[in-house]
Amino acid sequence: RDQLPYEIDGVVVKVNRRDWQSRLGMKSRSPRWAIAYKFAPRKEITTVQDIVVSVGRTGTLTPVALLKPVEVGGVTISRATLHNADEVARKDIRIGDTVKVERAGDVIPAIAERIPVLGEQRHTPFCMPDHCPVCGSSVGRDGAYFYCTGQSFCGAQLKGAIEHFASKHALN
């Protein structure tokens, strides 16, 4: 992979003979006559500088790690989603932690793991806010997910709804 003059994330091996392809058939999502082998994602070490909460168009609050910028597979990574509060707790990610970062599927920045450092002084564990960081409305919880109750009064939700409405997938 590293010796190639271009970026690839894996290799697809397939049967070329159409009569064999026809005999092998299809699975629900892919042909039985082809298989993809993905390389393990590249990983680099960096530091969590902060954890902020973003508000999506549906009001879902998502913790995001702000990272010391690091290059992973030709792309500079400075942010990575932490998905939800349960995932942050499971991985025990805190501000100041040394972490291993990867691009999941060679695309999406993700924290693969925390790297313990001998004698480190760790920050307090991350907690989701009680109020929306954008509009100040109270925050509700549904299983692992936290959400803003502000609906159309929340600037982030309103902006996201307008962007979604005007997108190719919605307005079309």
Model features per residue range: what roles?
Residues 1-172:
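RNA/tRNA-interacting regions in translation and RNA-turnover enzymes
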